[in-house]
């Protein structure tokens, strides 16, 4: 399986999107600072993921979620989470 996932930084409230074949191991790498892109922004919380059987589908979905339309989709999909965490009122969602 291929997993597309969204993490939220608990230090700066930023978001990070990526994909992996082993979601648990990859999350552990993010938490342990083993990923250059996220090492300085942890700890991280997994807030959303999708599973795909084909790599190409996961890569396409990752690319979409990083686009403007993808950010709008995530904003709608995570509406309750973002409202509870105070993002909706500020109109803020930052996706790396």
Task: For every predicted segment, state its role.
Residues 1-45, 49-52, 56-66, 71, ...:
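GIY-YIG nuclease catalytic motif and its immediate N-terminal context
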């Amino acid at each position: 399986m291929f997993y597309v996932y969204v993490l939220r930084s608990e230090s700066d409230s930023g978001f990070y999107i990526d994909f992996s074949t082993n979601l648990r191991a990859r999350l552990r790498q993010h938490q342990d600072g083993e990923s250059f892109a996220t090492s300085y922004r942890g700890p991280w919380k997994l807030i959303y993921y999708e599973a795909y059987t084909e790599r190409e589908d996961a890569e396409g979905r990752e690319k979409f979620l990083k686009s403007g339309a993808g950010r709008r989709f995530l904003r709608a999909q995570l509406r309750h989470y973002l409202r509870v965490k105070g993002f909706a009122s500020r109109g803020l969602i930052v996706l790396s």
